[in-house]
Curated annotation (Swiss-Prot):
Protein known as: Replication protein E1
Catalysed reactions, semicolon-separated: Couples ATP hydrolysis with the unwinding of duplex DNA by translocating in the 3'-5' direction; ATP + H2O = ADP + phosphate + H(+)
Positions annotated to bind ATP: G433, P434, P435, N436, T437, G438, K439, S440
GO terms of biological process kind: DNA replication
Top-level division of the source organism's lineage: Viruses
Enzyme class: isomerase
Length: 605
């Protein structure tokens, strides 16, 4: 027992496996073994019956039919139009798991016979044509649902070129191409106030609500829906670019940007304007606001189209005369701004000789104004000028300033009276004194209110520097120096006397005229200079001794404005011996304003 390893089992279980097999004499017979194997559980393993042919021909026929059906399906898939398949199941046909591959093109052609390339290109370029099924028209406002909208979405997704599909559907719905009504903006950042927007497959409720929601953004709205297409003409209150318009439409109509076509309209195309004008008269069109200006100009007959047949220069001259415009630049700019309201201005802008007419207009206005000035007396001129001044002022500020300069007001008033009446030897007044005493400011304020002319001795080298004296009622020669005094002493004695002189004018023969009342300012007291003794009797002088006073805010203490001079002349009208305007017809019989244009047929007499 010492050789046994491991633990010993309990009693009765000494061995855990059978070590030897028990022999049996019964199994020694081979015949019995074969008989027992034949009668095993797997019986009838071999079929020893006689063979017959069976139904093999039917099986072969079934296999041939199946193969023929497969070949037929392949031919149908190759040659049959997808339209038949789409009619069977449109939704199933619209589902595509793999994207369509575009045809490939080689950058460099190979130098061979071309046979292989031809076969390859034919195999690669063949792409199945997609035919979009016809979509039913838009239902009435009380009907419709999400099913039709889903069909429109499906039709748009099936198309390979969505923009071309939208353009085709737009033309099919409205009978006119989208590009025939619009002009193209390639940039998304270009702003415009007017936009034509076409939206595909909009829900009916959102389509109706957009008519009210867009009114807060637009001055004019034109909306129409046919079939699945909706057309908008929007005139926004402020300029918008395409991106802003798309954002507004997608938010309001709950559509994708691929469903939108947007371009600005053609503003100068009469046919396009007639489309919008006549379209608003048809059924199913909603409009809000007045017609845009470009539609009205191209379609509505009125003063801007029927009456603006020819340009009338006299109307332009009358306008410039009434507005006191003499310069060519002012006339051109002002009359161009008048174009939206005046038919004659529109005709002038359309003319090829705008500059020629502007020059002629300015020339005629100067002629008329000069003739009007010469026809007026000094009293009429002053009365006309001060009544053009708006507002009221204090005449006492002028009197206080003269007293501040220690000038006798009675003497100044008498000298001004003689000056305005052009009394010989009293036709010129001189303000002299130290610098910064207000001489030029006082003289310039008087010249401004009376619309006089200013002379500059810097132009004395030209023989035409005195030409403005023949075109005004009063003139000012500022800052007279010694060379100017010498010139006046030598050449202007007769002019200062108030007698007729020969005045040389540019492009014209010398004219016979009198010098108008002349005001001089200088730092030199000519009465204290013996060299100019011949001028002493021709010039009345007033000395400005004190510096011009200023306030703490650097504004003049004495207001020498147009309103102050208006009050001055009104208050001292009789003291200056100016004529009463009642005697000249101001309060008597009515006087017609000057008219230089032809009277219209319907004008009141």
């Amino acid at each position: 027992m010492a050789d046994s390893k491991g633990s010993t089992s309990k009693e009765g279980f000494g061995d855990w496996c059978i070590l030897e097999a028990d022999c049996s004499d019964v199994e020694d017979d081979l015949g019995q073994l074969f008989e027992r194997d034949t009668d095993s559980d797997i019986s009838d393993l071999l079929d020893n019956c006689d063979l017959d042919q069976g139904n093999s021909r039917e099986l072969f026929h079934q296999q041939e039919c199946k193969q023929s059906e497969e070949q037929l399906q392949k031919l149908k898939r190759k040659y049959l139009s997808p339209k038949a398949v789409a009619q069977l199941s449109p939704r199933l046909e619209s589902i595509s798991l793999s994207p369509q591959q575009k045809s490939k093109r080689r950058l460099f052609a190979e130098q061979d016979s071309g046979l292989e390339l031809t076969f390859n290109n034919e195999a690669e370029d063949v792409t199945p044509e997609v035919e979009v099924p016809a979509i039913d028209s838009r239902p009435d406002d009380d009907e419709g649902g999400s099913g039709d909208v889903d069909i429109h979405y499906t039709a748009l997704l099936r198309s390979s070129n969505q923009k071309a599909t939208l353009l085709a559907k737009f033309k099919q719905a409205f009978g006119v191409g989208f590009n025939e009504l619009t002009r193209q903006f390639k940039s998304y950042k270009t702003c415009c106030n007017h936009w034509v927007v076409s939206v595909y497959a909009v829900h009916d409720d959102l389509f109706e609500s957009s008519k009210q929601l867009l009114q807060q953004h637009c001055d004019y709205i034109w909306v129409r829906g046919i079939d699945a297409m909706s057309l908008y003409l929007l005139c926004f209150k402020a300029g918008k670019n395409r991106g802003t318009v798309h954002k507004l439409i997608t938010t309001m109509l709950n559509v994708h940007e691929q469903q939108i076509l947007s371009e600005p309209p053609k503003l100068r195309n009469t046919a396009a304007a007639l489309f919008w004008y006549k379209g608003c008269m048809g059924p199913g069109v909603f409009t809000h606001g007045p017609y845009p200006e470009w539609i009205a100009q191209l379609t509505i007959l009125g003063h801007k189209s029927a009456e603006a047949s020819a340009f009338d220069l006299s109307v332009m001259v009358q306008w410039a005369f009434d507005n006191n415009l003499f310069e060519e630049a002012d006339i051109a700019y002002g009359y161009a701004r008048l174009a939206p309201e005046d038919s004659n201005a529109v005709a002038w802008l359309a003319h090829n000789n705008q500059a020629k007419y502007v020059r002629e207009c300015a020339m005629m206005v100067r002629y008329y104004k000069k003739g009007q000035m010469r026809d007026m007396s000094m009293s009429e001129w002053i009365y006309t000028r001060i009544h053009e001044v708006e507002g009221e002022g204090q005449w006492s500020s002028i009197v206080k300033f003269l007293r501040y300069q220690e000038i006798n007001f009675i003497s100044f008033l008498a000298a001004l009276k003689d000056l305005l009446h052009s009394v010989p030897k009293r036709n010129c007044i001189l303000f002299h004194g130290p610098p910064n005493t207000g001489k030029s400011s006082f003289g310039m304020s008087l010249i401004k209110v009376l619309r006089g002319r200013v002379l500059s001795f810097v132009n004395s080298k030209s023989q035409f520097w005195l030409q403005p004296l023949g075109e005004c009622k009063i003139a000012l020669l500022d800052d007279v120096t010694d060379p100017c005094w010498v010139y006046m002493d030598q050449y202007l004695r007769n002019g200062l006397d108030g007698h007729f002189v020969s005045l040389d004018c540019k492009y014209r023969a010398p004219m016979q005229t009198k010098f108008p009342p002349l005001i001089l300012t200088s730092n030199i007291n000519v009465h204290a200079e013996t060299n100019y003794r011949y001028l002493h009797s021709r010039i009345k002088g007033f000395e400005f001794k004190n510096p011009f006073p200023m306030k703490a805010d650097n504004t003049p203490q004495f207001e020498l404005t147009d309103q102050s001079w208006k009050s001055f002349f009104t208050r001292l009208w009789t003291h200056l011996d100016l004529s009463d305007q009642e005697d000249e017809g101001e309060h008597g019989e009515s006087q017609r304003a000057f008219q230089c244009s032809a009277r219209t047929a319907n004008e009141h007499l």
